A protein has these predicted regions:
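Short beta-strand element of the alpha/beta-hydrolase
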Residues: 20-28
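Conserved loop-alpha-helix segment in the C-terminal half of the alpha/beta-hydrolase fold
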Residues: 195-232
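Conserved acidic catalytic loop of the alpha/beta-hydrolase fold
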Residues: 79-97
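Active-site nucleophile elbow and catalytic-triad environment of alpha/beta-hydrolase enzymes
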Residues: 161-177, 210-215
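Catalytic active-site module of serine/aspartate enzymes centered on a nucleophile-bearing elbow/loop
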Residues: 221-258
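Conserved alpha/beta-hydrolase
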Residues: 38-66
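Conserved hydrolase catalytic core segment
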Residues: 95-130
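Short beta-strand/loop motif that positions the catalytic acidic residue
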Residues: 181, 187-189
Length: 258
């Protein structure tokens, strides 16, 4: 366990394993992406860190944290987010990197990739890249409104940055910027993601992740992405089956020269 200090003194937890070209994963939990990261660390330097927006939300933090109140923001603090990402990379001894993630953290990785001058590639799974942000904006705004109406304003704050992120993302067209990334570009997903038999169907079935990615495979290909479909896996399985997923991701990264 290691701690990086942001420019304003905020403490950020991170873990770095392996040597080689770097992959940086934002994570919601200290355990998130640990198994995948360990599998990838045979060839890469894998850095996982918790962005300040998730600190203390899903698990308690003793070492990380600091003064931070997202409730007062009326626009997404993109400069702070990128500076934090770079502070972690510096602490981990990383220069340029491929930014990576799965599901919600894939969204954050994809949002940051075009604006970080050190992110040269993107490796994301379980998220419909280039499919627009309307569904996810509605998800965040609906969750926030429900909590406010239930008298849980303190919990509603947890969705404040999410709604600001998707509002800003909806005003951007990142297609050209993503195509211009010089490093690896990979999207992977389970063939059953958000289908009726998916274990996440009752929560985000409307996202139709597998169908959305398939329908944009040609567009992703034109932007330089390799699209990997993990046969028979749902949203959970396309991350949890490390022995199936990791070799395919390594092959795609190596094919792209990483």
């Amino acid at each position: 366990m290691s701690i990086a200090s942001a420019a304003d003194g905020y403490k950020l937890w991170y873990e770095a394993v392996g040597d080689g070209p770097a992959l940086v994963f934002p994570a919601r939990l200290r355990s998130e992406f640990a198994a995948l990261g360990a599998a990838l660390a045979d060839r890469y330097r894998v850095v996982r860190y918790k962005p300040r927006q998730v600190v203390g939300v899903l698990e308690a933090e003793e070492e990380a944290g600091g003064p931070w109140d997202p409730a007062g923001f009326d626009r997404y603090p993109l400069e702070v987010e990128v500076a934090d990402l770079h502070a972690v990379a510096d602490a981990a001894g990383v220069g340029e990197f491929v930014i990576a993630g799965y599901s919600g953290m894939a969204a954050l990785a994809a949002f940051l990739a075009p604006v970080s001058d050190r992110a040269v590639g993107l490796l994301v799974g379980g998220f419909p890249l280039l499919a627009g942000s309307d569904y996810w904006l509605g998800f965040e705004e609906g969750a926030r409104a429900s909590l406010i109406q239930a008298g849980l304003a303190d919990k509603a704050v947890e969705h404040q940055l999410g709604r600001l992120l998707y509002r800003e993302w909806g005003r951007r067209d990142d297609t050209a910027a993503l195509a211009a990334l010089s490093g690896p570009k990979v999207v992977w997903f389970g063939s059953r993601d958000c289908e009726p038999d998916c274990r996440m169907y009752d929560f985000v079935g409307g996202a139709a992740i597998a169908r959305q990615i398939r329908s944009r495979a040609a567009q992703l290909g034109e932007a330089g992405f390799e699209v990997i479909e993990i046969d028979g896996q749902d949203h959970i399985g396309a991350l949890a089956t490390t022995e199936v997923v990791a070799p395919q991701l390594i092959a795609a990264l190596m094919k792209a020269g990483w």
